[in-house]
Amino acid sequence: MNPHEIARFWEKVIKGPGPSACWLWVGAIGDDGYGRFWTQTTDGGQRMLRAHRAAAEIIYGVKAITDQLVTHLCDNPLCVRAENSREGHLLIGTHAENMIEREYRGRGNLHNPLWKHQGRAARATSARLLRAHTLAYGYDQHQVDELVRGIIMPGQQPLF
């Protein structure tokens, strides 16, 4: 990516406060709930990247992520927190490593109440609601937890 594209990318990110907060993508969102970012190709065309993959490319470099998956430790499809430290939320790895991590965190059980409501359309709707809320009111960890990760605190009233 060129410097203009990198600057344009970071203009679409709202960083949550604190060392463990997500950095939320507030640009385009695809029908799967993941952010979308377009860059120019060398032949004058365009290529579309998922926003978290674009963040990993910016921080780690194209070679580091070629033929690898970029996955989320935070389970937030809008998170683009790529860092060269333990605070980063994105991991680079293989499909097999991602499946092991998925099982370890209990995401492999499709009957788990935390994940069973999160089909493709529901995930996209939640992501768009979180983007709208963040743009209107700023970063809100409770909304990240409820809308994207499906975590509802005891006694918490619904947003809508």
Residue ranges, per PLM feature:
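Short helix-coil boundary/hinge micro-motifs
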Residues: M1-Q46, C74-D75, C79-A82, G138-F160
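Short, cationic Gly/His-enriched loop motifs
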Residues: R47-F160
